[in-house]
Amino acid sequence: EDINRIVYVIPALDGSLLVGEIYQYGLLDDNIELYSQMMPALMGVDEMAGYLVNIVLRIMPNADLNTILDVVAFDLVNDYMKYSTLLWGLVPSGNYEPCREMYLMDDSMAVIREQTDWFYNAQKNSDANIKEAVSQGVKVFDIVDYNVPLYEIIDSWDDVNADGVIHLDSTSMGAYSVGVAKELPKDYVSTVNNCTNPNHDHSDPRNIVDANTGLLPCTTFYFYNQNHESTGSNDVIMKLVSE
């Protein structure tokens, strides 16, 4: 009763594929992308340093390097990530159950498993809970960044649209897209329309996103080519949030 307005700003309502796939599959396993994409991404903004690392890594056999990365990812999850309920909260619902079987079934993980199971159930019911809040008069808004690829450290980095960190389906509560800078097929027909006002037009002028499939098309704002990290410095977004 005390909440009358909710503003989501690039929310991870269904986690981030970056986290989910690291838990479930480890790091990127494609040799070409490994050298050209992942290492520069891991080195951050210093691309030169990333490519210098690539030169050194190319001396190593591909199989050896992939084995090393698999071990690093496995140890990272087993020694640190599996104990963090915060990070478990960023595992998408589609990744949770197999990851739960992999890391949480030991008796020593019972306390953490209880908490992550609770969050997983809340995650699955997120859309229903938001719709219920709207029906009770709560105004819910969503700010979505899109058309920036996920960091190239997981195998499916190029399979979804994203803001660099969180995939579009999670931030937009279900908006459909084929991928970054990929137009919807000419024969595409939306099977979901969450806008009940026939006078509204939520079509993407670039034909990249079907906003009608998002849970709240009338109160969701999309920012093209906006990456996750610089959202806080976007004056338009900050003004929307504060008003």
Identify the function of each model-found stretch:
Residues 2-243:
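Lipid deacylating catalytic domains
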